[in-house]
Amino acid sequence: MTGPLQRRAIADGVWFSRIHDPKFYHNSISVTIITPLAEGKTSAAVLAAYLLRMGSRRCRDMTELECRLADLYGAVLDTDVSRHGENQLLTFSIAGADDRFALEGESISRGCAELLGEILLEPKVEGDAFPEEAFRLEQQYLIDTIEAEINDKRSYAAQRCTAEMGRGCRFALPRYGTVQETLSATPKEAYDRYRELIRTARIEIFFSGCGSPDYAEEVFTKLFDGVERAPLCPTPQRLPLRAERVTELAEQLPMSQSKLVLGFRTGLPQQRRVRTALRVMTALLGGSTGSRLFTNVRERLGCCYYCGARVNLLTGILLIECGLEEANRERLQSAILAEIADLAAGHITPQELSHIKLAFQSSLCSIGDSLARTEGWYLSGLLQGDPITPQQDMEEIASITAEEVAAAAAALTLDTVFFLQAVGKEDGCDED
């Protein structure tokens, strides 16, 4: 990338960001609706996002929508639903060739911005509700998606541990909602939730690529100029900093290997440098094939099939996820805790710290290879409140000391142990 993020408000609670990178031959425009996860409203928001991607008042079906995309030199439209800390994110994006490749001098970026804005703000409706037939199709698709989550046993175990640690907190709510919530939703409720989000949610718009964002900014400024906005400013929930006791939970499922998840509180550091040290410590502990958990616990002790660590800086939760034979459970858990204690004691060699920093450097250098990853990087930074460039992050990581890594490990407190016991292989299923 040639420069950092340039961002300005174009409406109340609506922000337009520019990221210029001349090495690409195309541009990406994304609109992310950011709203706190809310029990009873999550599924309706997802259904609304799925229905918006089906067309608009001027594109009454997928055939017409595909024709519009074809006229824009094969532009690609995408929709994504995700969770970031306490927030639900609904992202709509379009990618198209740069204007200089237009055969008749037209602006492809303007056309892409107009189509994306049309899909977002001029949905296809019947009266004051989404079309019944389209709603039922998307409702069943969402139910199937939610019910299929348990098929990924590793992800399911991590979600169960996180939900227990976040009991009573917004971040513990499922990103898609529940089957019951989805079944009880109606086309009108989904449309009402959509209108509520357009009025109250924080909205981040990105234009990234080689071209000029001026047309896109003009389009969205005019569009939101006609939208009634009353953005909400939710108060962040107070999250636990340390574990008061260890909660142990267990479930059984038909599968070929058991899963063990250890959930730790990290102290929820607020200073960026302390958070960076926590990231480095997590990577050193279990973030790569050169980490302690992989080298010592998996390879040397041989007491698990996999063992890795990841941290969520917004919730202050670090998870260690393992696949194992049940007979190795106690030995595995003891070995993991011993590795954390060893890091906390400061037993960190310059060589292993250097290797982890090089791994970070490689990963951060690759962010600029994709416009989607670049936008995701800056959006994540905005949600954390301190966006920096990947280069700035590399420089800070390079300066982290072994003492800072040890302090991050010493701040960990074990909160929850979730064990998913294998009770026989499920027919036709291989979750490993």
Where are these regions (language model features)?
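M16 family metallopeptidases and their MPP-like homologs
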Residues: S17-I19, Y25-A45, M62-E118, R154-G177, ...
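Glycine-rich, mobile lid/loop segments that gate access to catalytic sites or pores
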Residues: L142-I150, C161, M165
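His/Glu-rich zincin catalytic helix
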Residues: M1-A75, E104, T178, Y191-N296, ...
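Short, flexible, solvent-exposed loop/turn segments with mixed acidic/basic and small polar residues
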Residues: S82-H84, Y191-I198, G308-N312, A406-A410
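Catalytic domains that recognize anionic headgroups
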Residues: V125, N151, R199
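Short, polar/flexible loop-turn hinges at active-site or ligand-entry regions and domain interfaces
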Residues: G55-R58, R100-L103, E122-P131
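Active-site glycine-rich loop that binds ribose-phosphate moieties when present
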Residues: S184-D192
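Acidic/histidine-enriched alpha-helical segments
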Residues: E66, E122-I146, P234-R242, A338, ...
